[in-house]
A protein has these predicted regions:
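Active-site groove signature of glycoside hydrolases
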Residues: 62-72, 118-148, 268
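Substrate-binding surface in catalytic domains of secreted glycosidases
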Residues: 129, 133-229
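Short, acidic/polar
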Residues: 41-58, 108-125, 180-192, 247-259
Length: 289
């Protein structure tokens, strides 16, 4: 136990800048309204960046969330040239772009480097991302205490160095933690809320909650628990999905739960490649935001 504590302290000292304080909250408008998602496995989206951007724009999407890398990627930015062209194509259509990285918390220096890569990335036209986010879902590091320590240290670095760039936390939904209490006991909702500008819960139901009522109940409770945990002053963007694993009724249930919650400012389905006409139709009543 003593060695574990010392390791946790050492990790904090390595990762957190001395004297770093949480920066003032940035404008979270980038996370509002209709969004869609592109991950590192969506190579077809990059093959014709202009055509993909046009399709996204035709759906009224305000923000595209793009994964720059995860802890298993072979590069700090996956396919940087193609990504840059795609981001420029989106921005040419006045679509905002938020980058996200999935840290593993096993190699802190790797996570720091790849987090910083989001901030330093520039497109061929010189554009930066409009926002950045950490995808907090890896459970590879079995020590929950050390995982929490490293999450907070990484988030402090991101908050400190992001400046005016808005920062979001992408997380398992609160209901997911409630159903699986061993995943991440005592998740640091309060501490993280001081370090981010918005929360993005992955309220994915897929085939696990069949039917309208089950889907609605899971999403509604997830949003209600999250709002209780993080307070009323921080925006929430609800991400549902996976889109092609949901029926029309389940897609409607997600949208209805988001609308009924009353304080959610953004919404999306994961991901663009799997969202068909039924998915876009379900989101339509929420509007572009």
């Amino acid at each position: 136990m003593r060695r574990l504590v010392l390791a946790a302290v050492a990790a904090t000292l390595v990762l957190a800048p001395i004297g770093a304080q949480a920066a003032p909250r940035a404008d979270a408008e980038v996370f509002a309204g209709l969004g869609t998602w592109i991950d590192v496995y969506d190579a077809p989206a990059y093959s014709r960046p202009g055509a993909t951007a046009a399709k996204i724009a035709a759906r009224g999407v305000r923000t595209v969330y793009v994964e720059t890398a995860n802890d298993r990627s072979t590069a700090d930015i996956v396919k940087p040239t193609q990504l840059g062209l795609f981001v420029d194509a989106l921005k040419d259509r006045d679509i905002r772009v938020v980058a996200w990285y999935l840290p593993g918390f096993v190699k802190p220096s790797l996570d720091v480097r790849r987090t910083r890569a989001m901030l330093s990335f520039r497109t061929p036209k010189g554009a930066a991302f409009d926002g950045v986010a950490l995808d907090i879902e890896s459970l590879s590091l079995k020590s929950v205490g050390l995982r929490t320590t490293r999450l907070l240290a990484l988030s402090r670095i991101l908050r400190s160095e992001a400046g005016e760039t808005p920062v979001a936390a992408i997380t398992y939904p609160s209901r997911g933690f409630e159903r699986h209490p061993t995943w991440w006991p005592s998740f640091p909702w309060t501490e993280m809320t001081t370090l981010v500008d918005a929360w993005i819960p992955m309220t994915y139901t897929g085939t696990s909650f069949p039917g309208y009522d089950a889907t609605y109940g899971y999403v509604a409770r997830s949003l209600r628990l999250l709002r209780t945990a993080v307070g009323t002053d921080i925006p929430i963007h609800a991400a549902g999905g996976v889109a092609n694993r949901m029926t029309a009724d389940e897609l409607k249930a997600f949208a209805d739960a988001v609308a009924d919650e009353g304080t959610v400012t953004g919404w999306s389905l994961y991901d663009f490649q799997t969202t068909g006409p039924k998915g876009w139709a379900a989101l339509a009543p929420l509007g572009p935001g």
